[in-house]
Design a protein with these regions (language model features):
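A short Gly-Trp-Pro
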Residues: 3-166
Length: 166
């Protein structure tokens, strides 16, 4: 029988170890809205992390850029407050979710991709390791960090796959 050990990380993150081998089996991160009514958890590793510069994300986040982490549906779970989640569809590609009690934006469902975009600011224990900028053609804040700057999104996500210079 395999025995597992759960170790609390700083904050709400957890690492699950195989006690026999010491191998990390799974990492879990928890997040919430401002008031804590909506709580959620992601497990494992995100499919991608980066920055989105699209007009929609900028307006939704009220900032010049949005830091994202994309998770497969089976890695994402609402732990509490599902009845407090509001939803807005500007496009069929993005179903934006927020807490109806405090107004805090929590995540965006991308049904065509079967991915949940959990805003990095809502996962305080996640080590943010951005790999790409998407929708950079819409950028209002040029960032020179050496990461690829996608005109829209990667081809495997339905975009052109074209990159732009820094």
């Amino acid at each position: 029988m395999i025995s597992y050990h759960v170790q609390q990380m700083g904050g709400s993150g957890k690492v699950v170890f195989n006690q026999r081998t010491g191998e990390i089996v799974m990492t879990q991160y928890q997040g919430s809205c401002f008031c804590g009514a909506v709580k959620f958890q992601v497990s494992g590793a995100p499919e991608a992390m980066g920055y989105c510069h699209c007009d929609s994300c900028r307006r939704w986040s009220a900032g010049p850029v949005n830091a994202f982490s994309l998770w497969p549906y089976d890695s994402f779970e609402v732990l509490a407050g599902a009845d407090h989640i509001g939803e807005f569809h500007l496009t069929e590609q993005s179903y934006r979710k927020w807490c109806k009690k405090c107004g805090g934006h929590v995540f965006t469902d991308h049904p065509a991709l079967s991915l949940m975009d959990v805003y990095v600011a809502n996962l305080p224990d996640l080590a943010f390791e951005p790999a790409v900028h998407v929708h950079y053609q819409e950028s209002v804040l040029p960032i020179r960090d050496g990461l690829p700057k996608m005109k829209d999104v990667p081809a495997e996500m339905g975009g052109s796959g074209d990159t732009l210079p820094e």
